Amino acid sequence: PQSQADALLASADFAERYARFINSELNGGPASSAADDPIYYLAKHIVTNDKPWSDMFIGPYAITANAAGDGMDVKEDAKGLGYFRSPSWMKRYSGNEAEGYMLVGAFRILSNTTGLELTPSIGNPGDDRTDQGRQAAACRGCHFDSWYALDTFAKVLPKRKGQGDTMTFTAPTEGPQQILGKSIADDKSLVTTLVDSDAWRFQQCRNVFKFVHGRPENQCEAPVFDKCVDALAGQKTI
């Protein structure tokens, strides 16, 4: 019954279920271990403590493996950026671009905030996968010309150095990029701009709708969907 809705949403069971759901939606598959799952632990923290849902993406948090190695701790950290600066997320989505640009990370940020969906094209052995190669007609649409130009977005993200356990990241060196009509210099300004968009609010409500109904929303349900968007803009919390 409707009278029990508030109590159910405040329960530990809801926080657990929604954290698991959102973790499955925002990741490409299961993590290697419970100590490598920052999205799940941050989502549970956000819902449990009734924090603004935007904190999931831009909040000042550090999510690191706990001492036992069987989970992760969420602590406030002014240098944090939701889960996007957690080492495990950065390594997982660092990609393999030759110069260290996080093309995979750029796509994941766009997908998780706005719902962007792309169909990857599979190259052939010997194809030029460098910056110059990506400017070929078959590639430049996604990488340079569209509003979600992956190379442009990646230029404001940290750059990967090395591979595997020795992987590190350095600050971007390309300078500000023109993205979404703004001069964007780093990952924080990028994600903040995305979270301040209608596309972000719509995508978060798409996730809510799928969690509640087990399917995507459709056009005839627009009035209910719009109420979700308005509530997220006003109340801020899930």
Give the ranges of each region predicted by the language model.
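Mature N-terminal segment immediately following signal peptide/propeptide cleavage
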Residues: 1
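Extended surface/linker regions that mediate inter-domain or inter-protein docking
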Residues: 4-152, 209-213, 217-219, 224-238
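Primarily the internal scaffold of c-type cytochrome electron-transfer domains
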Residues: 125-207, 225
